[in-house]
Amino acid sequence: MKKYLFIALVAFLAVTSASAQLRIKMGKNSPIEKLGRAEIAITNLYVDSVDENKLVEDAIRGMLEKLDPHSWYATAKETKAMNEPLNGSFDGIGVQFNMVDDTLLVIQPVTNGPSEKVGIIAGDRIVAVNDTAISGVKMSKEDIMKRLRGPKGTTVNLTIVRRGIKDKLIFKVKRDKIPVTTMDAAYMIRPGIGYIRLGSFGLTSHKEVTIAMDSLKKKGMKDLIFDLEDNGGGYLQAAAQIANEFLQKGDLIVYTSGRAAPRQEYKAQANGRWRKGKVVVLTNEFTASAAEIVSGAIQDQDRGVVVGRRTFGKGLVQRPLTFDDGSEIRLTIAHYYTPSGRCIQKPYKKGDRLDYAMDLDKRYKHGEFTNQDSIHLSDSLKYYTLRKHRVVYGGGGIMPDYFVPLDTTKYTKMHRQLAAKSIVINQSLKFIDAHRKELKSQYKDFNKFLATYEVPSSLIDGIIAEGKKEKIEPKDEAELTQTKKYLALQLKALVARDIWDMSQYFQVWNETNEIVQRAVQLLTTGK
């Protein structure tokens, strides 16, 4: 459900002007006149006082809920929160943090950011902001972020507790633009094989990906794995720019068409950086929207193959209609189609958003994630790629060329319960904080860490013990063994993230990621 909400939040924005003139039918007995009279009557005559703004907002939401599952209304606050992760930057102090024991723990200061420049380091605890205590007072994460963020150029005083130093430290931090990156990882996964993982499609995504491509080519990249697993989408323009890097000038990337929106085509504007080397795109059931555009374009143009599982199936174009108060309607105006003519949008019932939200759950129960044969495709859904005329299928989402089943034995019920109670993340953060100095001293080179580091059994046993306090116990010895095995991998990845960065986190995970390993096998053996 959380993944579905994320996909809805980052559903890409069609680059269509929201200021287009709309003809509204006015006059006696018109629907808009009836709606206006109803609002006036309720506001002025209803027995109790009425919040007029909320009344109108609820009416807008009510109308949109009767349409498709991706048309929706957002308040000004919600709109800002939704756009920020995709807009490339925000104003703040520049730290990655987590809350541990009701205290803000700095995971990493942003490189060359305001906090790093004044000397704040990983492991510092921020206990007060401008003399207001934020530690041990049960302040919400949202309220803490409000205090830390502010306009560029303004200053904030931070009170810091640092391990090994008795007295509290005071830092004056001048807020600045903090970059928001969308690329999770880029590295050479094998000799000659580069790997790029993109988390979403934002304003800076194209630049991030092209810089990574150029860097990996210098390191000897001949083939590329482009990982779009869990990528919920983002901006259409970013998707078109990135797809362009795999195609030749003039190649069709995607087209949109709707009742009031004539067909609009998006084509490669130039020869791409990676138009000749092999490419494998990775997808799963949480790959959506803009990520499906890129996957579909590469597949339909026969530039590469798709490995993984069927994607989410979000193929509706939204136009943002912005009100003066900053709130917005995201109104579906068209479908988008891959170059072969496939509509990516999966079927839905108008007005039944709960059914739509439960679609992935139904697909899981039907066996789609574990058994390729559970997906029955009729001949009416057949399409053909544009160059090699391979069969591909429509009907919702992008079907992979090579199916990789979900390993359901990895994730035990016990582990899910431990994670839900935040026991895993809290214990890992405490461990890293206590051993950060020795870990950095012992593992100056990440490759040595990847090859030799083993998570202490005491850390895993401590997590199991904390779970027992919350009445979380395995059903049998087999579940306990599998839970410990998975914890060892997860904790190693978390240590790598906190000592280095997200790229190293995924390097640890990818050694056991079946979809990634299938792509490596395909590129190294050809089958």
Where are the predicted features?
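Hydrophobic beta-strand signal
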Residues: V127-A128, V254, V305, R330, ...
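Extended, small/polar residue-biased N-terminal targeting/export presequences
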Residues: Y46-I107, G153-A185, W509-V520, K527
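Bacterial Sec-dependent N-terminal signal peptides
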Residues: M1-K28
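Flexible, acidic/glycine-enriched loop-and-adjacent beta/alpha segments
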Residues: V305-Y337, K350-Y364, T370-L377
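Structural motif
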Residues: G123-R125
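Residue-level recognition of conserved beta-strand edge/terminus positions
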Residues: V129-N130, V161, P347, G395
